[in-house]
């Protein structure tokens, strides 16, 4: 039974801001979530990425020695470098999918063709271990390099 009206939305564009590259950062300002990186919501990564960013913030805030101090550049830079590592994975996954459509505008990642080819091979595999590892990567439980182990490569390409 329909419980309400059906609503559609349009996603205008993905944006990533590289705060980790700033030489100076406004003291006392914290930037997280979509303010740093807004990817296509179709992939459902926003909350997970924001939670991982919050953990990176907690790690960096623990480095502040006195309670009540504002966030000095000495903390801001390591924090943004930490979240850049988180965003690299999310961004590559989401943008890589977006760019398979010809209507997507912008500069394709250098690794697009190779990543797309490999992802297609992983998706075509009928090996349950490959599928399990793929979903662990997609849900940020494991880094993408876990799909590149000799065992996973064998299971992806040789075992059908």
PLM regions: where:
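FAD/FMN-dependent oxidoreductases across multiple families
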Residues: 1-78, 82-86
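C-terminal helical "tail/cap" subdomain of flavin- and related membrane-associated enzymes
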Residues: 58-160
């Amino acid at each position: 039974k329909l419980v309400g009206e059906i609503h559609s939305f349009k996603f205008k564009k993905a944006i990533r801001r590289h705060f980790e590259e700033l030489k100076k950062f406004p003291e006392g300002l914290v930037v997280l979530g979509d303010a740093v990186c807004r990817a296509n919501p179709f992939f459902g990564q926003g909350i997970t990425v924001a939670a991982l960013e919050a953990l990176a913030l907690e790690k960096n805030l623990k480095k502040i020695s006195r309670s009540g101090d504002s966030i000095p550049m000495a903390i801001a830079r390591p924090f943004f470098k930490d979240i850049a590592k988180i965003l690299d994975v999310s961004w590559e996954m989401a943008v890589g999918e977006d760019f398979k459509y010809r209507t997507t505008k912008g500069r394709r990642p250098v690794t697009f063709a190779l990543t797309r080819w490999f992802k297609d091979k992983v998706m075509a595999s009928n090996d349950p271990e490959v599928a399990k590892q793929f979903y662990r990567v997609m849900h940020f439980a494991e880094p993408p390099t876990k799909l590149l182990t000799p065992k996973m490569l064998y299971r992806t390409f040789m075992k059908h």
